[in-house]
């Protein structure tokens, strides 16, 4: 970029936030003074990296909120790699006591075929360790430990997705802490549906899976609140309509769009009850669920963790406050605002929040997250024994309430 191009992007970003950010007081931050300060820093910038990651985004992060970033054209796919990638290794990971531990393997995936199992510790991906990723990554708000831990795990998880056919080398420790290496090739995503959700972004994908557990309890997991997945999710709920209870697994679900989260919540409530309030620049806006036929009437438990963000937090927080669902897992990060995207000069992209989410009982989710009714953490030794402690706790709770 030339100096003039950088200046044009900078001014477009500052002005858009100035005019459209949800809070005209900017949370007490002097946005005018912040702009003046970073304009001075801009004058000393002589390369694009410094412009994007030492001036422009740090300026945005002064607001201390999620759902805000400015990205050059070549990085727009990085908004949420798990959402936009076509290929996958079929592995999910979390930071457990400072180790990057495999928490889930998709049957039939490259990771499954290579013998990787839940509980194995990943030391590096293509030579990059957790420490490397932590050093490279830009700290992003909200600045709480849950979000920072989740972001680090999420950055490592993003490396488990890529272009079909590309290879990746994973160094790991097995169940006996013996080192191993697996050379894996990204394969088409299992159980994923893909489609366009925003003209400014590439096609998005979400995995949808459901089954009946041994006790007849329904289990539904979907990896995003995305339009391409909505029909599959609603059909899964219909398939499980006679299950006495249903576990909806939103662990690791980074979010999606309002119509999708509202449609799924409506399928579980069926009455025009309050859903989410939005504090907008123009005032408070109330939203309501739709009265729909064929509502699922059984008990609902929702699984969440530090990577359940945005739409996952709205959906969960709303159903919790309405008394429709019991929440199990670990506290969500509080990365929960509604965002718009705006194209910038040179095909860059600005993401910014235009509304603050509140549950029907008035809880602000941004920065606070959803606190589970039953708090349970994953444990490596249990994973090695084939036990998902959070899922087990949900099943035990439902079996107890059925008595």
PLM regions: where:
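Low-complexity, Gly/Ser/Thr/Pro-rich intrinsically disordered linker/tail segments
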Residues: 374-403
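Extended, small/polar residue-biased N-terminal targeting/export presequences
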Residues: 25-98, 163-169, 173-207, 395, ...
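Conserved PDZ fold ligand-binding element
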Residues: 111-147, 220, 247-249, 319-322, ...
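PDZ domains, with a preference for the canonical peptide-binding region formed by the helix
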Residues: 44, 118-169, 260, 335-336, ...
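PDZ/PDZ-like domain segments forming the peptide/carboxylate-binding groove
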Residues: 82-132, 226-227, 355-356
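Active-site-proximal beta-strand elements of phosphoester/diester hydrolases
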Residues: 13, 104, 216-224, 353
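Cleft-lining beta-strand/loop regions that shape enzyme active-site pockets
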Residues: 162-345, 383, 397-399
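Mature N-terminal segment immediately following signal peptide/propeptide cleavage
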Residues: 2-26
């Amino acid at each position: 970029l030339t100096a003039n191009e950088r200046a044009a992007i900078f001014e477009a970003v500052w002005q858009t936030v100035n005019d459209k950010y949800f809070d005209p007081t900017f949370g007490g931050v002097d946005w005018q003074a912040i702009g003046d300060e970073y304009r001075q820093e801009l004058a000393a910038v002589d390369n694009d990296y410094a412009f994007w990651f030492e001036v422009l985004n740090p300026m945005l992060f002064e607001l201390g909120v999620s759902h805000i970033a400015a990205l050059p054209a070549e990085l727009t796919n990085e908004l949420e790699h798990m959402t936009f990638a076509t290929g996958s290794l079929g592995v999910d990971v979390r930071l457990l006591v400072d180790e990057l531990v495999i928490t889930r393997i998709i049957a039939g995936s490259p990771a499954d075929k290579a013998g990787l199992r839940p509980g194995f510790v990943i030391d590096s991906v293509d030579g990059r360790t957790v420490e490397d990723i932590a050093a490279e990554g830009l700290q992003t708000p909200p600045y709480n430990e849950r979000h920072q831990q989740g972001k680090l795990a999420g950055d490592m998880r993003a490396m488990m997705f890529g272009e079909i056919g590309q290879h990746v080398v994973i160094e790991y420790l097995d169940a006996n802490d013996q080192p191993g290496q697996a050379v894996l090739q990204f394969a088409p995503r299992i159980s994923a549906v893909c489609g366009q959700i925003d003209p400014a972004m590439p096609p998005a994908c979400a995995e949808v899976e459901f089954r009946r557990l041994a006790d007849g309890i329904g289990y539904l997991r979907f990896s995003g609140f995305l339009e391409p997945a909505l029909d599959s999710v609603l059909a899964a709920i219909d398939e499980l309509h006679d299950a006495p209870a249903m576990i909806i697994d939103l662990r690791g679900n980074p979010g999606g769009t309002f119509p999708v989260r509202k449609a799924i919540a409506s399928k579980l409530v069926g009455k025009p009850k309050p859903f989410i309030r939005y504090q907008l620049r123009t005032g408070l806006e109330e939203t309501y669920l739709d009265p729909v036929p064929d509502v699922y009437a059984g008990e609902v438990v929702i699984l969440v963790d530090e990577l359940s963000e945005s739409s996952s937090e709205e959906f969960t927080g709303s159903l919790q406050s309405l008394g429709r669902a019991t929440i199990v897992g670990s506290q969500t990060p509080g990365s929960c605002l509604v965002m718009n995207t705006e194209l910038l000069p040179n095909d860059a992209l600005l993401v910014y929040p235009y509304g603050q989410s509140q549950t029907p009982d008035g809880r602000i989710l941004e920065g606070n997250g959803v606190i589970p009714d039953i708090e349970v953490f994953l444990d490596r030794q249990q994973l090695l024994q084939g036990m998902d402690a959070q899922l087990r706790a949900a099943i035990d709770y439902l079996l107890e309430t059925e008595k």
